[in-house]
Amino acid sequence: IYPTKQIKNNYNMQANNTIRLRAISKKYPLITQVDRNIKNNFQDFWALRDVSLDVCKGEVLGIIGRNGAGKTTLLNIIAGVLSPTKGEINVDGRALGLFNLGVGFQDELTGRENIFLNGAIIGATKEELKNKLISIIEFSELGNFIDMPLGTYSQGMRLRLGFSIIVNLSFDILVIDEVLAVGDTLFQSKCFERLMDFKRSGKTLVITNQSMDLIERLCDRVALLDHGQLLFQGNTTEGINKYHALLNTEKFFVGPAQ
């Protein structure tokens, strides 16, 4: 979970609340030789190139593509963790990014204390966390362990606590990157149902996941990325079929999204 900065945000929520991306590009410098002191050793790597997308209020958009396609970079830009190198982004409402669960947790603090610490990092107020405390603890199913030091938790327990914090806070847009394999099968089902509740209540979700079954069950539309470019946006089933075709071919034409 990362704190999110808002880019051109409008907190007076409009009926047509959207995420609007126009010609978004993001580059990183790559070191091409071992000697880090020579400027010529750097070359630009474009993680995203001219990506334009709209996400409407209450829509669930799936971002799909092969490893290295640019999915995580795009989600980080939407959540405000990264700024684009080029292009324009408008995000209406409070966006929360659900990435590495439990970032900022302190092992010497109890689960209860970490709720307030992690919540503050995300940007929640102390009053909001107090009001949501019981809901967070109940959703996590940690029971008496909530008052034990986090250092005594298993990895699964830490992930459950991190997920429980984020899904019980107030937000308009939730950005989720590959973090739904939390806990056992029953808890994962519970997490999926909470996301379905968000969908039914009109929240906006942007999600990436390697499970195309989950993407098909949850998403209204998909956007297919490859080598940082948008190949397709539209119908979920059609997009997944194009993704599978991409996996099965060595070469794929990179052109404008349909």
Language model: regions and residue ranges:
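Pre-NBD coupling/linker segments of ABC/ABC-like ATPases
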Residues: 13-49, 236-257
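Conserved ABC ATPase "signature" region
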Residues: 116, 128-145
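A short, surface-exposed alpha-helical micro-motif characterized by mixed small hydrophobic
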Residues: 215-217
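Conserved ABC ATPase "signature" C-loop
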Residues: 227-228, 243
